[in-house]
Amino acid sequence: VYFGMHKAGKDYRAILVTEELTGFVAMEDRVQDWLEHGAPPRRERLPHLKAVATLLRTMHDHGIQHNCYFPKHVFTRINDDGSVDARVIDLEKSRWRPSRTICAIRDLYTLNHHSLCWSTSDRLWFFKSYLQIGRLTPFAKWLWRLIERRSRRKNRINPPRGRIAAKKD
């Protein structure tokens, strides 16, 4: 709805005001609900992960690194036709980077570390969806291992709570 920018010394300062994200739910809240009440079947979870992966991939394709890609900053909405839309907030720490790989390392690590309650298979499915691949390539394996190593190091300080498990019917 509004954008303003001015130069302050060597830096630029900007403000962005957008419309309310009506009908959207933060992935952090959605996943918390899944942890408390049991996750829906994979066929219902994966469209959310696909929408979040596509949004992140689009940002990285344009050289935009979010720098704080936490589940609380990513929102999804289920549309009437069953499709899922994703939106991201808190872009103030976003930066342009010359390489999608540079963007990916930081943002995928951040999301992975804060999504350790997701099952490993869901996180791997998200990762492959982000990369738009069906099977892991040597580059994808290198990137996955790098992200996992960083997450494990961070987990020694702040271990994750719980894992998502599908509801038992």
Where are these regions (language model features)?
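C-lobe/activation-segment region of protein kinase-like
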Residues: V84-R156
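A short, structure-level motif marking secondary-structure boundaries and short turns
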Residues: A39-R42, N112
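Hydrophobic residue at the +6 position relative to the catalytic HRD Asp in the kinase catalytic loop
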Residues: Y69-T76
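Short alpha-helical scaffold element within the canonical Hanks-type protein kinase domain
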Residues: R45-L49
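Conserved ATP-binding subdomain of kinase catalytic cores across diverse folds
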Residues: V1-Q32, E36-P40, A51-H62, H66-N67, ...
